[in-house]
Amino acid sequence: GSDLGFVYGVYEISRSILGIPDFWFWNDYMPEKKESYPIPEDYRVESVPFKIALRGWFVNDEVLLKAWEDDYSEEKPWEMVLEALLRCGGNMVIPGTDKNSRKYRKLASDMGLYITHHHAEPLGAEMFARAYPKLEASYDVHGDKFRALWEEGIEQQKDLNVVWNLGFRG
């Protein structure tokens, strides 16, 4: 089974009984007010295991979400991004890049999602150029500083469900 099985079941009920679409927030869906929502006697929610163990997305250009505050909260649009991912059967997310990745890791984890990292942030570490803007980003020259950033990234996420990204593309 899945640790998120109950969550997926709740979202299935919200779709099939309440009629709430998976992307309700993104298309300004307003539910119809009803006195009751009858549940058919033969109603069942069954699931089959996903064929792919880890399913998720990278929220690219996430800085565009910052301007979309809802309820006067920068976090609310992120909650809706992560809810949409869960509604679609996802279980893993790269919660942004640079400062945003650290800012929204806990929210994603609290919602039951695995965390992984942008290719420029191995082990979820702060980008070398951000931490040391005046130094050459060279492991040969500053290996100790890279290792310290990686260790800090691991320490910050040790209690989260993480799929560790070890590489850097290119």
Put a short name on every predicted segment.
Residues 152-154:
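Conserved Class I S-adenosyl-L-methionine
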Residues 1-146, 157-169:
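Feature activates predominantly on carbohydrate-active enzymes
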